[in-house]
Amino acid sequence: MASYLDFEKNIQQIDEDIINAQIKGDTEAVSILKKNLEKEISKTYKNLSDFQRLQLARHPDRPYALDYIELILNDAHEIHGDRAFRDDPAIVCFMGYLGEKKIIVIGEQKGRGTKDKIARNFGMPHPEGYRKALRVAGLAEKFQIPILFLIDTPGAYPGIGAEERGQSEAIARNLYELSDLKIPTIAIVIGEGGSGGALAIGVADKLAMMKNSVFSVISPEGCAAILWNDPAKSEAATKAMKVTADDLKSQGLIDDVIDEPTNGAHRNKEAAAVAIADYVKKSLNELENIDVRELSANRMQKILKLGAYQEA
């Protein structure tokens, strides 16, 4: 059953009217309602606020990493474990083919349904998850296979066990090692890009965001609680933090924005997957013509430029 956000109520009503008309066999009404639905979708999604985009980034029906992997990869095989502690289900790693290109995909997976969400820790990786990602990245470098990172997490897990096993070290190690990989790498924020939990698999030659995704150092609710002692002011915090894809592109913090279907990725997963696949193919064609040592050097320079400013 589809889920709807507060600002999608008119869309929900028309969807329900279409279902009722189909049950009655009223084809004329269905045709009229579908046209009305297209108009309402266009109207609703034309001028979304930053907070509404945040809601879309967290939409329960939004495609997750495994959805995209299933849609864009052929002959996919999963790689498990960090070879030190355990296999963290919050990080998924697959080797397969994107068209005719061999590729490795490493993604953060939130999970669907109560049991799956709990098993995957709501997409919050433990340090062993990041170490699994790094191990697989090492395999990719060894066999000269490009990597696609799919970022979607509220943040790295802050639990006691995670801290005892070196959460901060695992994130720092990934930043260090991924910045120097001698292979083409692409990272895409497909939903939430939560702080260090996102950065740990976000160091790449190309960093892109889906149109309705967000990327921030802290959640807007956390920001509002700290600055105003009121989590209810998260909408104001979202606007002030500039968390959307367009905001980050205008600041030069990401390379590209990937357009979603007009009605959002959650209502047309196949079209969203095609957009990602096309972007990855185009980017790989560009990156594969650059010497791997130059790629590594360019990646490092891009990192060093982050946060740079000039005094007036």
Swiss-Prot record:
One of its GO terms (cellular component) is acetyl-CoA carboxylase complex. It catalyses: N(6)-carboxybiotinyl-L-lysyl-[protein] + acetyl-CoA = N(6)-biotinyl-L-lysyl-[protein] + malonyl-CoA. Its EC number is 2.1.3.15. It comes from the Bacteria. Its main location: cytoplasm. One of its GO terms (molecular function) is ATP binding. Keywords: ATP-binding, Cytoplasm, Fatty acid biosynthesis, Fatty acid metabolism, Lipid biosynthesis, Lipid metabolism, Nucleotide-binding, Transferase. Pathway: Lipid metabolism; malonyl-CoA biosynthesis; malonyl-CoA from acetyl-CoA: step 1/1. The gene is accA. Component of the acetyl coenzyme A carboxylase (ACC) complex. First, biotin carboxylase catalyzes the carboxylation of biotin on its carrier protein (BCCP) and then the CO(2) group is transferred by the carboxyltransferase to acetyl-CoA to form malonyl-CoA. It is found in: Cytoplasm. NCBIfam families: accA, AccA_sub, PRK05724.1. GO terms for biological process: fatty acid biosynthetic process; malonyl-CoA biosynthetic process. Acetyl-CoA carboxylase is a heterohexamer composed of biotin carboxyl carrier protein (AccB), biotin carboxylase (AccC) and two subunits each of ACCase subunit alpha (AccA) and ACCase subunit beta (AccD). Belongs to the AccA family. This is Acetyl-coenzyme A carboxylase carboxyl transferase subunit alpha. The keyword S-adenosyl-L-methionine does not apply.
